[in-house]
């Protein structure tokens, strides 16, 4: 929003343009187009691409969260904190952006913020290049991976550990902390860089677009931007099919498939691609002027659309006024831009207290906090949940979210906006629609408690076998073996449907590779823990109920769609529930509360809940690292239970809002009746 001096300058320019328009001008001169950097339509195109790329780079981490955990040995609590850390930088600067928004060169600030986002993306990929190649077992660097290191060998023949305890404590742990520190720094920079992009871009469009075209431009912008998270999951699905060290593959290749639980995809490659897109999208912003000529004409498309109704001008004004809340939602309006910093600090507490005392505002924001907490946890950990619960690959889990869940959520947002506009819903009707959407979302989540796969038998972990790793039929079958406790090379006894953490723990002494046209299959032989010293296959046991992932994700997606319907009506409740002079602050407070109470803590809460269901942790240098196995039933109950808790909170808040609005309506009706009777008596 321009300040007073800017408005005065623009007003003078408008008067000058009206004077010039009275003079005859050459028709050829009129036909000459303005430069593309003086065209608001080109700015809309550039900003749509930039916000799309920004959401891709910020959402990509969520698509590869389980892969990053495996690569760097992180718990879900730590990875959740990492995913939420970009909110720290964002929150720390958003108030300054709101206050000084009209005092800076907005396009250049957007460009600088985008460059910082790209730098953050490069930093996120940096740990891959400065770390050692990924070793998916504990073989020594000079040995062939996945061979003798995991076999049952006598103590005298066992391969030595690759790292001593001294080197582990002094070198490996330092490198681990360095990698994690780099990623947390990158997430902070990602949040800081994203601060000016959306607010400055939308305010710039609204300032220099024709008042009737502005809602259309912003609608196009939001429609394109909403595809960003879906593309991020799609990109994650593609990248995680590639091996993490695709740029430095070992000479002998690898003996892993994407279905192997030790598989780590090329998580870093998506950050490089997204960062490159952000740099390309940021380049034009350094050539846009601080102020461009105001768009003077309405689009012919809009004229045709609105021709059948009221006059174009009135329709355009109506749409502009209805879209004004969307501008405020993005943090566009500056908080008291005509006040000095000292005056702003004096006024702020009084207005803040007045807004917080409003019951409708408080309840709607609390409901949005619950919904946002549910969304933040789902977006961060649902791919990992699907991987573990249904034994599917990370690539397929991301594909399901990107192609089904996110598109249906976008449809829900659009449907909610259309219902509010077409039906001209009152505040009470908006609250009823929100209540209905929350109720349907809650009901759709009930079957999720019963759709899932139980943890299959894992020798020594999910079976009550005392101290012995082998089945109870063969006690002590792997005692002669010198098995490393922290090794992980899962194998499956398909006859008994029992999984072992390594061939060594199954007592296997031999290894056979069967070559095929498309892939090779590895088997381990002479296994003392298997009936008849039989043969077992490499890899985890396949789940017998993986097919249930489709009805599960369908219910999740339908729930996301009906929950998204409440987005626009709940926002309208905030705008219509506070005083006109407090709307800007109310929207700003809503924005801050959602980030502080939902988007920051929710991934950490969900990650902590997931960690409590772990039954076997990997150990790195004596510390607890990534979880190898979960109790699937407990994981499902706690993850879905947490979602159910937040959905219930949202439902209760909307029910209270509807009850308050009905009470206010009855009181207003009673007052009107009393006033009417008093007038009749007079």
Curated annotation (Swiss-Prot):
The record ties this protein, via InterPro entries, to: Kazal_dom, MFS_trans_sf, OATP
Transmembrane residue ranges: 42-61, 81-101, 108-132, 177-206, 226-246, 265-289, 355-376, 397-420, 425-448, 553-575, 585-610, 644-661
Q: Which residues carry this modification: Phosphoserine?
A: 21, 311, 314
Organs and tissues of expression: Expressed in liver, kidney, heart, lung and retina. Widely distributed in all brain regions.
- Where would I find the Kazal-like domain in this sequence? 471-531
Tell me the Pfam families matching this sequence: OATP
| GO BP annotations listed | bile acid and bile salt transport; liver development; monoatomic ion transport; organic anion transport; sodium-independent icosanoid transport; sodium-independent organic anion transport; transmembrane transport
Q: Describe its membrane topology.
A: Multi-pass membrane protein
Annotated catalysed reactions: coproporphyrin III(out) = coproporphyrin III(in); substance P(out) = substance P(in); taurocholate(out) = taurocholate(in); prostaglandin E1(out) = prostaglandin E1(in)
> What ranges does the record list as Basic and acidic residues composition bias?
13-30
Cystine pairings recorded for this chain: 477-508, 483-504, 492-529
Its subcellular locations are:
Cell membrane; Basal cell membrane; Apical cell membrane
CC per GO annotation = apical plasma membrane; basal plasma membrane; basolateral plasma membrane; plasma membrane
Which residue stretches are annotated as topological domain Extracellular? Answer: 62-80, 133-176, 247-264, 377-396, 449-552, 611-643
Entry keyword set: Cell membrane, Disulfide bond, Glycoprotein, Ion transport, Membrane, Phosphoprotein, Transmembrane, Transmembrane helix, Transport
Spans annotated as Disordered: 1-30
- Give the domain section of the comments: A conserved histidine residue in the third transmembrane domain (His-128) might play an essential role in the pH sensitivity of SLCO2B1/OATP2B1-mediated substrate transport. Transmembrane domain 1 (TM1) may be localized within the substrate binding pocket.
Return the PANTHER family for the record.
ORGANIC ANION TRANSPORTER, SOLUTE CARRIER ORGANIC ANION TRANSPORTER FAMILY MEMBER 2B1
Query: Per the similarity annotation, which family is this?
Result: Belongs to the organo anion transporter (TC 2.A.60) family.
Protein's name according to its UniProt entry: Solute carrier organic anion transporter family member 2B1
Q: What gene does this protein come from?
A: Slco2b1
């Amino acid at each position: 929003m321009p300040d007073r001096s800017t408005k005065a300058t623009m007003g003078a320019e408008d008067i000058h343009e009206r004077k010039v328009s009275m003079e005859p001008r050459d028709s050829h001169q009129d036909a000459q187009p303005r430069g593309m950097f003086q065209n608001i339509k080109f700015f809309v195109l550039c900003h749509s691409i930039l916000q799309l790329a920004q959401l891709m780079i910020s959402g990509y981490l969520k698509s590869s969260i389980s892969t990053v955990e495996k690569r760097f040995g992180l718990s879900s609590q730590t990875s959740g904190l990492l995913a939420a850390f970009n909110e720290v930088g964002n929150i720390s600067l958003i108030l300054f952006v709101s206050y000084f928004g009209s005092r800076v060169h907005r396009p250049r600030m957007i460009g600088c913020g985008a460059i910082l986002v790209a730098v953050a993306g490069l930093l996120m990929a940096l740990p891959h290049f400065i770390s050692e190649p990924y070793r998916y077992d504990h073989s020594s660097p000079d040995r062939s991976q996945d061979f003798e290191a995991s076999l049952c060998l006598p103590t005298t023949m066992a391969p030595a550990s690759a790292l001593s305890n001294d080197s582990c404590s002094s070198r490996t742990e330092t490198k681990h902390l360095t990698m994690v520190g780099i990623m947390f720094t990158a997430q902070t920079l990602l949040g800081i860089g994203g601060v000016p992009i959306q607010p400055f871009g939308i305010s710039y469009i609204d300032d220099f677009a024709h008042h009737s075209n502005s809602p259309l431009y912003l609608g196009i912008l939001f429609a394109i931007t909403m595809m960003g998270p879906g593309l991020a999951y799609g990109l994650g699905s593609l990248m995680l099919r590639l091996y993490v060290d695709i740029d430095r593959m070992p000479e002998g290749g690898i003996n892993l498939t994407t279905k192997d639980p030790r598989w780590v995809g090329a998580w870093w490659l998506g950050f490089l691609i997204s960062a490159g897109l952000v740099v390309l999208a940021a380049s034009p912003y350094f050539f846009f002027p601080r102020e461009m000529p105001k768009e003077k004409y309405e689009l012919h498309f809009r004229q045709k659309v609105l021709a059948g109704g009221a006059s174009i001008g009135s329709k355009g004004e109506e749409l502009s006024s209805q879209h004004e809340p969307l501008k405020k939602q993005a943090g566009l309006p500056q908080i008291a831009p005509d006040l000095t910093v000292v005056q702003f600090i004096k006024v702020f507490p009084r207005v803040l207290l007045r807004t917080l005392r409003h019951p409708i505002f408080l309840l709607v924001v609390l409901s949005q906090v619950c919904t946002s907490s549910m969304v933040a946890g789902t977006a961060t950990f649902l791919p990992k949940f699907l991987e573990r619960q249904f034994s599917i690959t990370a690539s397929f889990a991301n594909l399901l979210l990107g192609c089904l869940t996110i598109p249906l959520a976008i449809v829900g947002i659009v449907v909610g906006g259309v219902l509010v506009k077409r039906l001209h819903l009152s505040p009470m009707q908006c609250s009823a629609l929100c209540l209905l959407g929350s109720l349907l979302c809650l009901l759709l989540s009930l079957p999720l408690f019963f759709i899932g796969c139980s943890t299959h038998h894992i020798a020594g972990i999910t079976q009550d076998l005392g101290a012995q790793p082998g089945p109870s039929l063969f006690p002590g079958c792997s005692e002669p073996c010198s098995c490393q406790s922290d090794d992980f090379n899962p194998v499956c006894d398909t006859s008994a449907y029992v999984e072992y953490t390594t061939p060594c723990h199954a007592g296997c002494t031999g290894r056979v590779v069967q070559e095929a046209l498309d892939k090779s299959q590895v088997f381990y032989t002479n296994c003392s823990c298997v009936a008849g010293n039989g043969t077992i296959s490499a890899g985890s046991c396949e789940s017998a109920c993986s097919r249930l992932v489709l009805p599960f994700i369908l219910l999740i997606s339908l729930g996301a769609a009906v929950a998204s319907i409440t987005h626009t009506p709940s926002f309208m409740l905030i705008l219509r529930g506070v005083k006109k002079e407090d709307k800007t602050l109310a929207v700003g407070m809503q924005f801050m509360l959602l980030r502080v109470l939902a988007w920051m803590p929710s991934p950490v809460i969900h990650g902590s809940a997931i960690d409590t269901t772990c039954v076997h942790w990997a150990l790195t240098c004596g510390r607890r690292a990534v979880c190898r196995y979960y109790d699937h039933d407990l994981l499902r109950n706690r993850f879905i239970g947490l979602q159910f808790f937040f959905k219930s909170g949202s439902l209760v808040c909307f029910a209270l809002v509807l009850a308050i609005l009905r009470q206010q309506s009855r009181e207003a009706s009673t007052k009107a009746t009393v006033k009417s009777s008093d007038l009749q008596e007079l």
